[in-house]
Curated annotation (Swiss-Prot):
It comes from Mus musculus. Disulfide bonds join 84-108. This is Golgi phosphoprotein 3. Residues 1-11 have a biased composition (Polar residues). Expressed in all tissues tested including brain, heart, kidney, liver, lung, salivary gland, skeletal muscle, small intestine, spleen, stomach, skin and testis (at protein level). One of its GO terms (cellular component) is endosome. A 1,2-diacyl-sn-glycero-3-phospho-(1D-myo-inositol 4-phosphate) binds at residues 81, 90, 171, 174. Pfam families: GPP34 (PF05719). The lineage of its organism: Eukaryota, Metazoa, Chordata, Craniata, Vertebrata. Belongs to the GOLPH3/VPS74 family. GO terms for molecular function: cargo adaptor activity; enzyme binding; phosphatidylinositol-4-phosphate binding. The keyword Nucleotide-binding does not apply. Its main location: Golgi. It is a peripheral membrane protein.
Amino acid sequence: MTSLTQRSSGLVQRRTEASRNAADKERAAGGGGGSGEDEAQSRRDEQDDDDKGDSKETRLTLMEEVLLLGLKDREGYTSFWNDCISSGLRGCMLIELALRGRLQLEACGMRRKSLLTRKVICKSDAPTGDVLLDEALKHVKETQPPETVQNWIELLSGETWNPLKLHYQLRNVRERLAKNLVEKGVLTTEKQNFLLFDMTTHPLTNNNIKQRLIKKVQEAVLDKWVNDPHRMDKRLLALIYLAHASDVLENAFAPLLDEQYDLATKRVRQLLDLDPEVECLKANTNEVLWAVVAAFTK
């Protein structure tokens, strides 16, 4: 409770100081007209980002968030028994690309097709700045005829019996994501000896970022629960679904008290019981998101 109070007071101090600095700059500029208003709005936007605790250095992709939830803090690797996270991370990539305006589903036409039969098409091939995302986007763009969401999850994971399609597999995804997190100051890199071989591991070095991620997931199904997926932030909704599909959501709920844990899992179950075919017809939805959900919950 004390640490929460300290963080809150710290945010207030930063907010007050930022407002004071912005006011001083505006007075020094002498009003400034329209350009001054634009600069003030830009400063407010930057301040909002700081208040959320999401600076450019620590803003994580969906894939990085799911991996971070699955990594053991001290050991620096995911559970050897987790065989779900590989496909889960590929689902994250498709949703991340869709949220960034790069992918969409083909039009459903007069005879409405199901989400799982509609093909994924490239909406924009503009680089994202993320090597893994750009690699996946290149595959989708260059593949004719197009593939469905479920096929892409399997192809990007290398789960295909067709030797002509093995080149679609994205290799060393977890290691590459971990290196991204190292560059962002979240993880570090170590070598550990496992009997007959050495293994590169990535222990947690910035616990604040992981705790903030865990708190965000917990609050989404507890204190900030809205009982309507369309009123939730799409990225957060996708994180809950994909963390569950990757079998790492339990790690975010482990610290909860029994009553909170039961309530959180009950609300996640409510989300899992939704029909993606129905939800994708509602206003302001992302069809790729619901298609990925359908692929994992069918």
